[in-house]
Amino acid sequence: GLRGGVQYWDGQFDDARFAVALAREAVAAGACVLNHCVVQHLLYEQGRVVGVQAQDEESGQALALRAACVVNATGVWVDQFRPKDTPMVAPSQGVHLVVDAHFLAGTQALLVPRTEDGRVLFAVPWLGKVILGTTDTPRQDLPREPQALDEEIAFILREAGRVLRRKPLRADVRSVWVGLRPLIRPQAATQQAMTRQLSREHWINLSSEGMLHVSGGKWTTYRAIAEDVLRHAAEAGLLPASAVAMPAVAPPSDATSPRQAQVSLTQAPGPHLYGGEQSVLAQLPGHARELAPGLTEAMVRFAVRYEMARTVEDVLARRSRLLFLDAQAAQTVAPVVAALLQEEGCEHVALEDFQSLAKSYLLN
């Protein structure tokens, strides 16, 4: 039984929505941001990387993009653009199971530092549900949507059952999803090295072809990583020294109001997640029409008009997080979302692709 514990404080955020917010801020600052474009190969001049050849996946248009500095920030796939060099990433996958909030008493997260094999287990309230995780399994094939192994699912359910109000079963899992970690491998590490022993720090390399490669790290240090990349670029003469300046980030004008201060990511999703843009959301058609828990028609339209959403997956996985919270609900509402996307002018909404994806997030 439980003999004692330690209370501490940590941060929590919505990674996908935060990434979209960063992209929008970049556009506002003058950046050109391309969505749904795939890099096909690098462009060279006199043995130096000077850009990329890309393709717009929606229109099929070929794009030759040139830049003074090309940065390879492709996470676990970083080594695919440095085939002549020693691989620096030892990929690892972490599995997460989502269950209803009643499995965890209260709204505080629970961290169990000791499990049967030495890994930690966490139960974190998030957007009206509870995330259970995680695992640390080496992975070399690097699919875009990795699948959880049966033994990983069994481990999480078994260990969670020892500390939660009641033991969760496979039938209780609303969604299962997997993240890939770009862990940096020391030069002396072997293929047998345990991934949980590898560094979570970032790594930057300037290739002989004049291309910067960065991988590793985590969201907590993303600004420090960006500053480090710019510093390397300036030192290599790829960018001016002035590019390294990282201005402080000011909070939104309403971030300190009593109403905003009460917002928590433990709450079920809703208009409160839009912060100072709630008034914009309220003016869109379908503001009062709920399509699924925490998702309204207006939110779908907002995702297209202001958040660069083009497909059903964009909306249900990367703007709303419904796929990660309740895969069955996401699968059910997908046709309605597809129709709204088409109304908003999106031509290739990829409904069938999303339905297939949603099945892989279901255990039952």
Residue ranges and their predicted role:
Residues G1-G4:
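Glycine-rich phosphate/pyrophosphate-binding loop
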Residues Q7-R17, A28-A29, Y44, T74-V76, ...:
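C-terminal accessory subdomains/tails of enzymes that are appended
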Residues Q7-Y8, Q53-D56:
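Short beta-strand segments that buttress and anchor functional surface loops
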Residues N35-V50:
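A conserved short coil-to-beta-strand element within the FAD-binding core of flavoproteins
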Residues R48-V52, T107-Q108:
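Short, hydrophobic/aromatic-rich segments at coil-to-beta transitions
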Residues E58-C69:
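Core beta-strand elements of the Rossmann-like FAD/NAD(P) dinucleotide-binding domain
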Residues N72-T86:
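Flavin (primarily FAD) binding-site architecture
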Residues P87, Q93, A101-L104:
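Extended, Lys/Arg-enriched charged tracts that mediate electrostatic binding to polyanionic substrates
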